[in-house]
């Protein structure tokens, strides 16, 4: 548990330094909490590459990762994620994911970049 907390802190620090490629390396970590942290961190880095890295996380098996990725996509105005977020908002099995994705989708479709 302590190792995971330390890894989450490391990922957030990498995000604060805008190190997208270093953050992306953890996007396939076996622990969903780590992948969720990756999604949230990518939401702090408003680049095309961050948005592209969110796409696999929007398809993650864990609902909290999908919800975090949809929110992160809206946070960075990743218009190229809009269709993926829309699918989650209207078709995901998990009601929490649908709620987070619906909010994110509304923000994405109204944002102008």
Regions found by a protein language model. Give the residues of each.
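HEAT-repeat alpha-solenoid elements in large eukaryotic scaffold proteins
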Residues: 1-8, 28, 59
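Core register positions within helices of long alpha-helical scaffolds
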Residues: 10-14, 41, 72, 79, ...
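Short inter-helical turns and helix N-cap capping residues of alpha-solenoid HEAT/ARM repeat scaffolds
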Residues: 30-31, 61-62, 93-94
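Mid-chain, well-packed structural core segment of small domains
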Residues: 63-76
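Amphipathic alpha-helical scaffolding segments comprising HEAT/armadillo-like alpha-solenoid repeats
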Residues: 14-27, 45-59, 78-90, 110-113
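Short, Lys/Arg-rich amphipathic alpha-helical interaction segments
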Residues: 87, 91-111
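Conserved hydrophobic register position within alpha-solenoid helical repeats
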Residues: 7-10, 38, 69, 101
